[in-house]
Amino acid sequence: MATTVKVLAKELKRTAPDLLEQLKAAGIEKGSEDDSITEKDKTVLLEHLQKEHGSAETGARKKITLIKRENSEIRQADSAGRTRTVQVEVRKKRVLVKRSDEAAALEVEEAPAKVIAPTEPVKSILSAEELEKRAAEATRQAELLARQEAEMKAAEEARQKEVAAPVVEKEEKPVDNAPDAAATAAEKKATADKAAKDLAATKEKELADIRVRRAAAEAEALAIRDMMSAPARVLKAPSEIAAEEAKKGTLHKPAKPEGADDKKKAVAKVGGKTIKSAETSSTWQEEGAKKPGGLKTRGDSSGGVGGWRSGGGRKKQRQIAEANVDTNFQVPTEPVVRDVHVPETITVAELAHAMAVKSAEVIKLLMGMGQMVTINQVLDQDTAMIIVEEMGHTAHAAKLDDPDLDLGTDGHDAELLPRPPVVTVMGHVDHGKTSLLDKIRAAKVATGEAGGITQHIGAYHVETPRGMITFLDTPGHEAFTAMRARGAKATDIVILVVAADDGVMPQTKEAIHHALAGGVPIVVAINKIDKPEANSERVKTELVAEQVVPEEYGGDVPFIPVSAKTGEGIDALLENVLLQAEILELKAAKDAPAQGLVIEARLDKGKGPVATILVQSGTLKRGDMLLAGSTYGRVRAMLDENGKPCNEAGPSIPVEIQGLGDVPAAGESVQVVPDERKAREIALFRQGKFRDVKLAKQQAFKLETMMENMEEGAVEAKLLPVIIKADVQGSQEALAQSLMKLSTPEVKVQIVHAGVGGITETDVNLAVASKAVIFGFNSRADAAARKLAENNGVDIRYHNIIYDAVDEVKLALSGMLTPDKKEEITGLVEIRQVFLVSKVGAIAGCLVVDGIVKRTSSVRLLRDNVVIWTGELDSLKRFKDDAKEVRAGVECGLSLKGYNDIKEGDQLEVFEVTEVARSL
C-alpha cells in the first residue's frame, strides 16, 4: 500500500499544507495531499530537515571506539599450601579519531628554520585526540609569535620616528645662546643615540628569542603531523602480531605467545625508580601512559601471575607458565582429507594410524561389510583401499618393496650415454636360426675371439661399422616369456627368422604373439632365399595375416631377405637392426651402480650357483655386492662371452658371474647395493612379507572365479583370454572359429595363442603373463608344464569333443555377464493409524491386506495409487515383539527408514529384488 502526503502528515502529527511546503522546500513537487510518497522522497525530506536544523552529519564517523577484554587466571597458593585460581578480566578501551581532509588541507606547512627532531623513531604514547590538540596549540603559538613579531616591528618604527621628531623641532627654533644650545643639543643627541642603540639591541634579542621559539613550535607541530600521518600500527591484527613475534623465536627459545607478553618487559631507571617501559602491545600503547604498571606483588615482575610464593618449585612454575600460554589453536571446521598410501598388505592398526582414526572405527566399518577382524588382522590392498575411500580419504597404491625405494637412486644424476641394442633371434628351429647366428659370428667377431659360441652363456655381442649389437641366444622362448611375465623388458628388438621355402609355422606364430604382447619391434629375416623353391611373397602374405605388415605394404616392419649359407643380406639385416635402435634412442648410465636381468642360472657342482647377467645400465665390477631377487652375494668371478675373466661389464654386455648364495630365477632383476647389510635386509624382506603377495600375483584366472575377478559395471567389453593347443591344424582352426563366434558386445573371447602339439612350458608362461586359460584338444601337457602350471595356478582343461569345449567356454562367458535384476511384488499393506513417537518418528499401525511382509523387504509408499516414496522398512513388530514376517490378515506396526510423511489411508507395496543369471 503506497503512502500519501495525508497519511504521512497524520503520522508526523502535522497538517498536510505544512508538509507540502516542507516537501517543496526539499525539492519534491507534490500537488495535493493525495499524492503518493516513495521511500526515496522520505529520505530526501529527512536529509533536508536535518540540514536545515543543523543536525545532519556532513561526513563519516570521526571516532571509533575499540574495546578489548582479556580473561586470564592467576593461581596463588594460600597459607595452607593449597592452590586457588582467581579469574581476572582486563578491559582496555581505545578511541581512534579520524582527521577530516579539509582540516588537513587548511594546515599551512612552513619549512622550519631549524628542525629539532628526535634521532630515534617517535613512539606515540598519546591518544589521537591529544595529538590533535597539541598540533592545534603549536599552530596557534606560531601564529601568535608571528603577530607579536609584527607588532614589535611596528612599535619600533613608531618609536624611532618619535625620537627623531624633537631633534628636528629644536633645530628649527631660533638660536638665542649658540654655545649652550649646541652643547645641549649634542648631549641630547648622544643620549638619544645610545637609547636607540640599546632599544634596538633589546628588540633584536627579543626577535631572535621569538624566532627560536617559533622554530621550535613549528618543528614540534611538524613532528606531530608526521606522527599522525604515519601508518597506524594499531590496525595490525593481534594474530599478525603474534605471527611476527613467533618468527623472532629461536630453536631453543621460541617466541613468546601474545597472551604471555606481559611477563618480561623492558625496565628503565628514572631517578632511581623502576618503572615499566612503553614497549607493550602496539594495540594498547595509550594505556601505558595513562595507567601505572601491572599488579604490585612484592617485587614479582610477573604481574601477580606467580602468586605470593614460588609455587612449588620449577615444575610448578613451568605448569603455571604453560597454563597461561595462548596456543592460538583453532578447532578444524571441515573434515581433513588425507592421502593414504596403501601397500600390498597392511594391518588394521596400521591402516587406522595412517588415517588418524581409532582402530575401533575401522573394525566397525569392516564389521558392517561382513568381516570380523582384529587390530592385528592383515588386509589386502583392495580391501584397505575400499576402507580408506569409505572413510572419506584418498587412497593411493604404494610401491611393492618399501626397502627398494632407495635402490637405483645413485644413478639418477649420471650422464645417459647411448647403449648397444639387445636383440633376440626367434623363429622355428628348422628355419636356419642357428646357421644365421653362426654366419653373423663368423663375419663380425674378431679373429682373436675365434672359436665356437659359448653355449652355457647363450649371449654375445658383435662389432659393426655403425656400432655394437648384443645377441641373446636363449634355448627356445622360455626366458623371453618369463621376463615379460615378470614385467621386465630385456629385449629391445626381435629378429624373426622365417624360411622362404616353408613359410609361417606354428612356432613362428607363437614368436609373433610374444613380440606383439611385449611391445617389441620386429625385424623379419626371410632365410634360405638361395633355394630354388623359395617364395618370399608367400611368406609376406602369411605374415600379413598374423598382423605383421611389411614396409612395402604400408606397414612398419622391415623384411630383409638373407641367406645363412652364402651370407647374402647379413649386412642389410644388421643395418636395419641398428636403424631400429636409433629410432628407439636407447640410452643408459655408465658411471652408476649396475642394474640388469638374469638371463639364465644353474647350479654348478664345482662353482656353485652360476648366473648369466645382462647389464642394462651402470657398470658391474668384480667385488660388487649384488642383489638378485631374494638372494644376494659378492661377485667373486666374472666371465665374458668367450669364457675369459673380466673385471667389469658395461650396459648391454652379458657376463657370467659366480658368488651368489642361491640360484636366482630366470628373469629376476639384479641390482648392486652399497653393502652386505642392505642386501641382507632387502632379501629377507622379500622372502618374508611378500611371499604371499608373490603367490597371489602368480594366480591365473580360473573359470570358477572369473566373474569375481572381472570389474563390475565396466563400459568396455570383458575379455576371456584362452590358449588353444590341438592335435591337428584343422581341429585347432575349427575350435578357434567356434569360440570366436561366442563373442558378444559385452563379453568377448580373446585367443592369445592357438597352436598344434602338446602343452609346453612356453604355453604355461604365456598363460601366466596374459592370465589365460589353456584348452587342450586331444593334446596333453608334459611333466615340466604340469608342474609349472600347478605352481602358478594356471587352469588347464582337456577335451576330446569340440562341443564340450564350446559349452564350457559359453558357460564361462555367461558367468561374466552382468545379472538382470527382477522385482517381485510379495504383499500389500494398508495403513490404519499413525502414531508419532519422540526419538523414533512416525509409527504406522497396519493391516496386511495381501501376501506377506518381511523385515528385509523393500516397500513403496502409495498415496491415491501414486508412488511417492521407495525405500526399506526400519522396523516390523507384532504387538511388542519384533517380527521377521507378517502374513495376510494380520495387523502389525512398522516404521520406514528415513521417512516420516505417512498418513492414514496410505498403502505400502512390498516387493523383493532378485538377480537372474543371464545366458548367451
Curated annotation (Swiss-Prot):
It is found in: Cytoplasm. Residues 149-175, 186-197, 255-265 have a biased composition (Basic and acidic residues). It comes from the Bacteria. Keywords: Cytoplasm, GTP-binding, Initiation factor, Nucleotide-binding, Protein biosynthesis. Residues 527-530 are annotated as: G4. Residues 452-456 are annotated as: G2. Pfam families: EF-G_D2, GTP_EFTU, GTP_EFTU_D2, IF-2, IF2_assoc, IF2_N. Residues 473-476 are annotated as: G3. Residues 301-311 have a biased composition (Gly residues). GTP binds at residues 427-434, 473-477, 527-530. GO terms for molecular function: GTP binding; GTPase activity; guanosine tetraphosphate binding; translation initiation factor activity. GO terms for cellular component: cytosol. Residues 427-434 are annotated as: G1. Residues 418-585 form the tr-type G domain. Belongs to the TRAFAC class translation factor GTPase superfamily. Classic translation factor GTPase family. IF-2 subfamily. One of the essential components for the initiation of protein synthesis. Protects formylmethionyl-tRNA from spontaneous hydrolysis and promotes its binding to the 30S ribosomal subunits. Also involved in the hydrolysis of GTP during the formation of the 70S ribosomal complex. This is Translation initiation factor IF-2. It comes from Polynucleobacter asymbioticus (strain DSM 18221 / CIP 109841 / QLW-P1DMWA-1) (Polynucleobacter necessarius subsp. asymbioticus).
